[in-house]
Structures are given as C-alpha cells and as structure tokens.
Amino acid sequence: MTIPAVQASGLTKLFDQKIAVDHLDLVVQEGEFFGFLGPNGAGKSTTIKMLVGLLRPTAGTALIGGVDIWTKPLAAKGMIGVLPEGQTLYERLTGREFITFAGVMYGLSEAEAAKRTEELLGLLALDDAAEKLIIDYSQGMRKKTALAAAMIHAPRVLFLDEPFEGVDAISGRAIRDVLQRLRQRGTTIFFSSHILEVVERLCTRVGVIANGRLVAEGTIPELRERAHAGEASTLEEIFLRAVGATHQDGTPEDERTLSWLA
C-alpha cells in the first residue's frame, strides 16, 4: 500500500472551547497538487499549521510520509517546505543571505545552498534585488523570497498558505511557473488560496472546509457531479454550493441588501 504524502486523522483544534477544526480526516497522495479551500475563518490556516507542526492539535494525528509530525518532528519536518500565511522573514538580511541561510538550516552544505540560491534568484526574477535588505522588499518580492526558502531543499511536500495574496500579476506568473515545475518533478503541493481561478487551473484535486469540517473533496469533475452542477460550472459555483452560500439552482442563500442601495 502506498504511504500518503499527507494524512490527517481526527484532527481537532479548540480555542477556549470553540471548535476551529472538527475531527478532520484528509489524505493527500504523493505527487498531488491539492487545493484546500474555505471561507474566511473556516479553519484552513489552522489546519495547515497543525499539519506542519506549528500548532499542536487538541486531538488527532498529522502524518507526513507516514511520519507523525508531533512525535517525530525532525524527521517529518525535513520532508516539508512551508510558505505560511503572513510569513515573517529576517528583514535585516538580504534576499540572497536569507535563502542561503534557509538552505543551510535544512542541512545543505554552504556551497550547495549558495548554488541553489543563485538558481532560485534567477528563476523567481529576484536577481536584481538579491543584495537588498528584505525590509525594503515589496509584498511580491517577500512572497517569492519565502517560496525560495521553502523549496531550496527540494522538499517532498510543499505547503503554501495564500501564496498569491498581495502579489502582482508578474510575480504571480513567476510563482505559478515554479509550482508547475515542482508538480512535474513529482513534488506534492498542499495549496490554500482564495483565488479560485488559480486553484482550478493548477490543482489535480480539491478539498473544501467550512466551519472546521471537510464538506467536499475530489477532482473538479467529481465535485461538479456531487453538486449536481453542469459541466460548464466553475469552481467558484461549486465552492459556493459546497459551503452553503447558494441554493442548488445557484441563487444566493443570503439575499440581504443595503437599504440605501435598493
């Protein structure tokens, strides 16, 4: 039996007795480009933080390549790269220094880390800014720098939480191109985003979370069929039905309006 790249079993998180993630079961196989969707506050970022070992679950387990992220953290974390939401970078380092530092921290030799850093700087169009301090970087440059640091060690699984948030079209295209290359080499990508067109274009399978529970999972054709949506239905239409924002006929569940715009 093939060992899944990512597996969550009964994953639960409570904050002051409020359920943020509710007994979530999820399996992502090797080489999948998995899109993880949900409304604001649905539990996406909380789930990702538990899967990568940044937030301890109240209950349940999270496995990376069959290794428990909490009982064997070094072994599990060595297999992953993480681009978290609201990433924090060392702003007094240059982009080149930060990416190289990340490579060494993941166990690469200084020479190998430096070599890979130069390749990543070129691939992500960061060459001209490589000697600038990160404190002077734009949002898009910071995202690309964080992505480079997350993938410098060629992780088995790459977790991306809102990688396109606040990113311009040029930086967005560079990031998409890199993700496509990673997918082609067999990297498993766990990808959370509110930009559904990008998810629809890139992902091989999608999961939808609402109120801390996984409410839909499958390929886009499978989700269309389960939602009784037509073949031309977009992922946005499928998503809105899955989270209960629209009725089966596509009309809004909540039709409240502003009285002064009526």
Per-region residue spans from a language model:
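Catalytic Walker B motif of ABC-type/P-loop ATPase nucleotide-binding domains
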Residues: 158-162
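Helical segment within the ABC ATPase nucleotide-binding domain
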Residues: 173-185
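Conserved catalytic motifs of ABC-family nucleotide-binding domains
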Residues: 154
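ABC ATPase "signature
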Residues: 217-218
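Conserved ABC ATPase "signature" region
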Residues: 100, 104, 111-129
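Conserved ABC transporter NBD signature motif
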Residues: 60-71, 75-76
